[in-house]
Amino acid sequence: MSDRQAALDMALKQIEKQFGKGSIMKLGEQAERRVSTVSSGSLALDVALGVGGYPRGRIIEIYGPESSGKTTVSLHAIAEVQRQGGQAAFIDAEHAMDPVYAQKLGVNIDELLLSQPDTGEQGLEIAEALVRSGAVDIIVIDSVAALVPKAEIEGDMGDSHVGLQARLMSQALRKLSGAINKSKTIAIFINQIREKVGVMFGNPETTPGGRALKFYSTVRLEVRRAEQLKQGNDIVGNKTKVKVVKNKVAPPFRVAEVDIMYGEGISREGEILDMASELDIVQKSGAWYSYNEERLGQGRENSKQFLKENTDLREEIAFFIREHHGISEDSGAEGVEDPTLLD
């Protein structure tokens, strides 16, 4: 053994003695190189994310215009975690949580931990305490824009508080990121969008709360309404596009198209029908949809209704979609972190 190697081994032993086992290791020896994921609750979004869902122990940012479906997407993730026996928490900084709607999306409201903090500091401290407990699988903060610093709440209405929220978020994320990774908690931050003043060229839209969240996020999702869905003259929902703007665990810029139905959330039948048609698992001839020479219905809405009533057939088609994209259905679905996508 060379003197250099002996010196390195001694240094490694000293580091492990001082900071604990696992504080330093060779990358190839790391037991958890593979990224464990939890389904987003939407098959189309799982495919767009590239690894079959949200990566555990990471920060996710979901942003978009008002009423675009940001909270709906987050509630579906909570419902999926609960379905697998996990614990979920919701920090409702906007004080706008609708338990009836959440229940319709499959959320077990009797088991969901809910906090409606008075200040941004309080909300982030509660989030930190829950994450450090190691007993929470997913935590949603709704929203970053509503995490108002204490100084702003206690000040007068016209007072200027430049950069206060950005400093709050930067400090909180520095403390939270390590704890989130160790506890394997999925932390979803919902964010709004704002317009930059005086931007002549390029995109004038930005998200509040400074730049820290953009850097710390493993995945950033942009949620936007594409068009209205109608039954006759009635508007029953929106076709929504979810774009993966940033992704450290798979290639970014993939887009998931989902139907968000009023009072129901993401239509599983709609996304399965669209994806199966693209892959030719379901054949479309004129207005008719068919699977294995069995007609599902005339028109998209009738075919969606048929799949809703025939769940075994729906899940069989979903299985073939997952198989095509190499996505596992169980919560232990794994993907390898791509080093070329790291900041």
UniProtKB/Swiss-Prot annotation:
A GO MF label: single-stranded DNA binding
Subcellular location: Cytoplasm
Main location: cytoplasm
Keyword Nucleotide-binding: yes
UniProt entry keywords in alphabetical sequence: ATP-binding, Cytoplasm, DNA damage, DNA recombination, DNA repair, DNA-binding, Nucleotide-binding, SOS response
Listed GO biological process terms: DNA recombination; DNA repair; SOS response
PROSITE patterns: RECA_1, RECA_2, RECA_3
UniProt xrefs under Gene3D superfamilies: P-loop containing nucleotide triphosphate hydrolases
Residues that bind ATP: 64-71
Keyword Nucleotidyltransferase (UniProt): no
InterPro entries: AAA+_ATPase, DNA_recomb/repair_RecA, DNA_recomb/repair_RecA_CS, P-loop_NTPase, RecA-like_C, RecA-like_N, RecA_ATP-bd, RecA_C_sf
Any one annotated GO CC term: cytosol
Summary of the function given for this chain in its UniProt record: Can catalyze the hydrolysis of ATP in the presence of single-stranded DNA, the ATP-dependent uptake of single-stranded DNA by duplex DNA, and the ATP-dependent hybridization of homologous single-stranded DNAs. It interacts with LexA causing its activation and leading to its autocatalytic cleavage.
Family per similarity comment: Belongs to the RecA family.
NCBIfam families recorded: tigrfam_recA (TIGR02012)
HAMAP family (UniProt xref): RecA
Name the record gives this protein: Protein RecA
Organism: Bacillus cereus (strain B4264)
